[in-house]
Amino acid sequence: MKKYLALALIAPLLISCSTTKKGGTYNEAWVKDTNGFDILMGQFAHNIENIWGFKEVVIAGPKDYVKYTDQYQTRSHINFDDGTITIETIAGTEPAAHLRRAIIKTLLMGDDPSSVDLYSDVDDITISKEPFLYGQVVDNTGQPIRWEGRASNFADYLLKNRLKSRSNGLRIIYSVTINMVPNHLDKRAHKYLGMVRQASRKYGVDESLILAIMQTESSFNPYAVSRSDALGLMQVVQHTAGKDVFRSQGKSGTPSRSFLFDPASNIDTGTAYLAMLNNVYLGGIDNPTSRRYAVITAYNGGAGSVLRVFSNDKIQAANIINTMTPGDVYQTLTTRHPSAESRRYLYKVNTAQKSYRRR
């Protein structure tokens, strides 16, 4: 078990040096750090597999909160896309007690991602007077869960009525699954509307676009992380988009992890980057709808890759786009962009933005 603890201690140091696809300039140190982070995550996944068994690896992601405790024998998994909370344990003694404790802490955890290490088994989850999941989950009587007494009673109900077990050949896994309320996505989005409106006014970016990016990137999960270390609600990367924004604001260095895990700071930085894409990197595109399609795609795959779809010369690329209808630009980006992820990304964000415009 010592090697798992050592990995957990090393993880935060390596994670802070990583980055992802969003941003502009090539950075050799970033490439090395990204490779190191990939190696670390591979080791972390391998260690979880050793403990839990084959095909039982679950790791935190942009839309998945996963926290291990009890020497990695118990885990809480919130799937923000599916709207499910699954608490599991492989503890050989008193598994119900391990599940009960994890259920209560998960239901009552706060919304400060910087205080929780998702890459260790340290029990650093604090019970909050304003639980992050309040209103997104109701108990067996249909009531939202704010206090420890109600959470404890619900945990007892779940263990009595919904406890399941399965064997993977190596371990017996005990689990309880909780369904979130049907409109859990809207409940989370509502938490951040004030911050979105403030950033929208500050940078001149449409609220509906900010919300659509947040939904697509993280499903409004403030704990969002990625294998390439994009952080927070808008999946901002310290050493690429974060650095670009800081430079444009006259700041040196890069935003810290704690800065990007703060929802207001994350939304401000992500929106500032959208404004940079719109006004600077892709400002040569005249039609606002065509430029919006380019900005959305660039937020995922970079402005350079967007322009290269049309021409290797940036100025010529903008000129070509300016001769096309917005529909043709959309069609081109969703069919000819070299990245399948970026092609899907434009479709997802554009669809989500339409729904927010109707509200």
From Swiss-Prot:
Which key words are in the record?
Answer: Cell outer membrane, Cell wall biogenesis/degradation, Lipoprotein, Lyase, Membrane, Palmitate, Signal
The residue range of the signal peptide is 1-16
Reaction catalysed? Exolytic cleavage of the (1->4)-beta-glycosidic linkage between N-acetylmuramic acid (MurNAc) and N-acetylglucosamine (GlcNAc) residues in peptidoglycan, from either the reducing or the non-reducing ends of the peptidoglycan chains, with concomitant formation of a 1,6-anhydrobond in the MurNAc residue
CDD domains per record: LT_MltC_MltE
Q: What is its main location?
A: membrane
> Where does the UniProt annotation locate this protein?
Cell outer membrane
Q: Matching PROSITE patterns, A to Z? A: PROKAR_LIPOPROTEIN, TRANSGLYCOSYLASE
Covalently lipidated residues, kind N-palmitoyl cysteine: C17
InterPro entries registered for this protein in UniProt: Lysozyme-like_dom_sf (IPR023346), Murein_transglycosylaseC (IPR023664), Murein_transglycosylaseC_N (IPR024570), Transglyc_AS (IPR000189), Transglycosylase_SLT_dom_1 (IPR008258)
State its Enzyme Commission number(s): 4.2.2.n1
Q: Which domain of life is it from?
A: Bacteria
Lipid sites, type S-diacylglycerol cysteine:
C17
Q: How does it sit in the membrane?
A: Lipid-anchor
* GO molecular function annotations of the record: hydrolase activity, acting on glycosyl bonds; peptidoglycan lytic transglycosylase activity
For this record, the Gene Ontology CC terms, alphabetical, are: cell outer membrane
Q: What's a GO biological-process term for it? A: cell wall macromolecule catabolic process
Q: Which family does it belong to?
A: Belongs to the transglycosylase Slt family.
Summarizing the function annotation, the protein's role is:
Murein-degrading enzyme. May play a role in recycling of muropeptides during cell elongation and/or cell division.
Q: What is this protein called?
A: Membrane-bound lytic murein transglycosylase C
Task: Tell me what organism the protein belongs to.
Answer: Escherichia coli O157:H7
